[in-house]
């Protein structure tokens, strides 16, 4: 496993970031400047709250491709904590949300850095065989 860019801290949390490969893929992140980008366009209140209130710099996340061949592709690190997502208030952006008032975005985003691509994808079917992952929301019906 590759080294993480900052020392582990005792309160590190682990997250799952899902993206459709046609919208934003692992390769898009890997090819971004410094392998870093913002995780924008999230329009789910629970996910927004996690990004805004709980994701901390140094936390790690699994990068999950949804779609035809779903699975965990790589590991990312949160490098900037939650802040307002300006795509929500830009009418020209595909993530525009007319419910956001004026320049005030009700949505949040974090910045992430690609740490490591896994040697092979970890599939949903494989995750379902692991008893220690039984309570993982991703594995529950209706959570994908």
What positions do the PLM features span?
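Contiguous surface segments at macromolecular interaction interfaces
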Residues: 1-29, 36-37, 44, 85-144
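Short alpha-helix capping/helix-loop boundary micro-motifs
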Residues: 40-51
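Short, well-ordered loop/turn sites that connect or cap secondary structure elements
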Residues: 52-56
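Short beta-strand or tight-loop elements
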Residues: 57-59, 108
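Short beta-strand-centered aromatic/proline hotspots
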Residues: 60, 71-83
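Short polar/acidic secondary-structure junctions
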Residues: 66-68
């Amino acid at each position: 496993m590759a080294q993480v860019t900052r020392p582990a801290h005792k309160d590190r949390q682990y997250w799952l970031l899902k993206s459709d490969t046609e919208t934003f893929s692992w390769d898009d992140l890997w090819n971004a400047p410094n392998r870093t980008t913002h995780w924008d366009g999230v329009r789910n209140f629970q996910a927004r709250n996690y990004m805004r209130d709980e994701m901390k710099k140094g936390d790690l996340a699994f990068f999950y491709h949804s779609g035809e061949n779903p699975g965990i592709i790589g590991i990312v690190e949160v490098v900037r904590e939650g802040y307002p997502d300006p795509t929500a208030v830009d009418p020209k952006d595909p993530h525009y949300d007319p419910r956001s008032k004026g320049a005030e975005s009700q949505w949040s985003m974090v910045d992430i850095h690609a740490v490591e691509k896994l040697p092979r994808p970890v599939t949903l079917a494989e995750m379902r065989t692991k008893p220690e992952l039984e309570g993982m929301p991703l594995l529950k019906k209706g959570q994908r």
